[in-house]
């Protein structure tokens, strides 16, 4: 499972081998980005892309297990993004559906359980309280994820999250060479985009962030007896920042735009998840409530 990670983890040498001497940053970065945009369709076609909907299979590492499911990524520029996961974490008919994303200044987060057997309850962590520091941090994280996906897929920074691009040098591994673009944005947003020198398409995007977590509690039977409370476990310690690498491949043309149909992530060098898209739609007609808080 996750066999393709062997290819991508091998290419992590790009980030470890050091970079060649840097050129005049902004000008070189602009030239490379223009070259990359031409490689995936050109400015005329890319400027017309205001939305994407990508749906397919999800594989995720969960402890020492691998779980499978479905994933949908909906993106509407300049400020809307929704990721929907549908998985069976217990390996049975119980299906956990989670939604997370952003609509302007509103965090989108929802979860529900379908087909849970009688006497079983699957509990997901509740969303942060409105106006809390946790909600503000989640809002920043969601904006950052929208920006990363927008750049990785369309080489476009969303207007809601303006980014600065500078040349980061050339990286090399036994797999080949890549041009490196450093990205900086609002707050502490920092990332690196690696462009394959052979075809100029996005190959990898690296950043530091909080590892995605899924905490699921199960309860069978009648639950706590009369007079007892269903106790919530104490809050976990603040998560630490980790190195996250996003790999992109299996490019195919969709309405004249070359888009990756396979995306994988590694966290601190270990396989985390991969998306294998069966359908990718450009400028889909989203339902009115797609990005509505639930």
Question: Residues of each region from the PLM?
Answer:
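N-terminal mature ectodomain segment of secretory-pathway/periplasmic proteins
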Residues: 31, 38-118, 164-172, 185
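Acidic/charged, solvent-exposed loop-and-adjacent secondary-structure segments enriched in E/D, K/R, S/T
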Residues: 106-150
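Soluble non-cytosolic domains of exported or imported proteins
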Residues: 26-30
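Bacterial N-terminal signal peptides
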Residues: 8-17
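Short, conserved active-site entrance elements at the starts or edges of catalytic domains
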Residues: 141-182, 203
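Bacterial N-terminal signal peptides that target proteins for export
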Residues: 1-9
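Gly/Pro-enriched, hydrophobic low-complexity segments
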Residues: 172-293
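Sec/Tat signal peptide C-region and signal peptidase I cleavage site
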Residues: 19-24
